[in-house]
Swiss-Prot record:
Keywords: ATP-binding, Cytoplasm, Fatty acid biosynthesis, Fatty acid metabolism, Lipid biosynthesis, Lipid metabolism, Metal-binding, Nucleotide-binding, Transferase, Zinc, Zinc-finger. It comes from Acinetobacter baumannii (strain ATCC 17978 / DSM 105126 / CIP 53.77 / LMG 1025 / NCDC KC755 / 5377). Pathway: Lipid metabolism; malonyl-CoA biosynthesis; malonyl-CoA from acetyl-CoA: step 1/1. InterPro entries: AcCoA_carboxyl_beta (IPR034733), Acetyl_CoA_COase_Trfase_b_su (IPR000438), ClpP/crotonase-like_dom_sf (IPR029045), COA_CT_N (IPR011762). GO terms for cellular component: acetate CoA-transferase complex. Binds 1 zinc ion per subunit. Zn(2+) binds at residues 45, 48, 64, 67. Its EC number is 2.1.3.15. Residues 41-298 form the CoA carboxyltransferase N-terminal domain. Residues 1-21 are annotated as: Disordered. This is Acetyl-coenzyme A carboxylase carboxyl transferase subunit beta. One of its GO terms (biological process) is malonyl-CoA biosynthetic process. The keyword Electron transport does not apply. It catalyses: N(6)-carboxybiotinyl-L-lysyl-[protein] + acetyl-CoA = N(6)-biotinyl-L-lysyl-[protein] + malonyl-CoA.
Length: 298
């Protein structure tokens, strides 16, 4: 039987012409190509199901290059992306306590350790001082993967410290909100953070300093009922879910079916709840421009 040897492969006469190499043209081995493609970890877009490498999605600010879906962004990645230069991280001295000795299916300290291992963070809020387009500012971001971005005493401590430093330095405060609400494991102490953060925001406003909130997916509960809805300007990312109680809870309470876009950023924009929806790629310039106008900067 006649056989051909091309590029290290043994080809029989029965090999289809589509699989035969063309003289002068080198074709990469299919298995090697697939192996090279998947040597780097990939992320599947929840909207179009495209596989995108972590490097590519990170470079694109966690926006799917195929369908433009805004994927969830980790708090530290978001702040490092937002600032041109980070000066300092705030509130690292605060650590969670367990005064209620709370236990559900497991003790609260065990849940905290699991969240810290999962995210690499010590709490659900990260606050930083930095600059954007030449303007110094303070920004904080919720880490949703840390117990659903829930607000406990340390989240309140860090937010208040960020607001106080903003007043001291005469700088604007930006908050990227993403939370399921107050942290039930801390009971009334977590609910008190709604009042604490609201009071800190009022002091910021009394000082004549801007407070801009960026509502990312999702924002619910006590965070919505306090610091997330007290901004001078509310920006939402596309398709973000924003509300107090979730859609399912509301439907079970009122015994009615709610329309599909309910609580979506676009629906809330149409009803005057948020001021604008901004694509993530335009967010830095939008915030920079708003801060310059609100602070009468050149």
């Amino acid at each position: 039987m006649n056989q051909e040897v091309k590029s290290g492969k043994v080809l029989s006469p029965s090999t289809p012409w589509t699989q035969r190499p063309v003289p002068g043209i080198e074709v990469a081995d299919e298995q090697q190509t697939l192996k090279a493609t998947f040597t780097e970890p990939t992320i599947e877009c929840p909207e179009c199901h495209a596989l995108v490498t972590r490097t590519a999605i990170s470079f694109n600010a966690y926006v799917c290059p195929q369908c433009d879906e805004h994927l969830r962004m980790k708090a530290r990645d978001r702040l490092n992306w937002f600032f041109d230069n980070v000066v300092a991280e705030l509130g690292q001295e605060f650590s969670a306590k367990d005064p209620l000795k709370f236990v559900d299916s497991k003790p609260y300290p065990d849940r905290m350790r699991e969240a810290q291992t999962k995210t690499g963070e010590t709490e659900a809020l990260i606050a930083m001082q930095g600059n954007l387009n030449g303007v110094d500012m303070i920004a904080c971001a919720f880490e949703f993967d840390f117990m659903g971005g829930s607000m406990g005493t340390v989240v309140g401590d860090r937010f208040v410290k960020a607001a106080e430093l903003a007043i001291e330095k005469r700088q604007p405060l930006i908050c990227f909100a993403a939370s399921g609400g107050a942290r039930m494991q801390e009971g009334m102490l977590s609910l008190m953070q709604m009042a604490r953060t609201s009071a800190a925001i009022q002091k910021l406003k009394d000082a004549g300093l801007p407070y801009i909130v960026v509502l990312t997916h999702p924002v619910y509960g006590g965070v919505t009922a306090s610091l997330a809805m007290l901004g001078d300007i509310h920006i939402a990312e596309p398709k973000a879910m924003i509300g107090f109680a979730g859609k399912r809870v509301i439907e079970q309470t009122v015994r009615e079916t709610l329309e599909e876009p309910f609580q979506r950023a676009e629906y809330l924009l149409d009803h005057g709840v948020v001021d604008q929806i901004v694509h993530r790629h335009a967010l830095r310039d939008t915030v920079s421009r708003l801060v310059s106008k609100l602070m009468n900067l050149p």
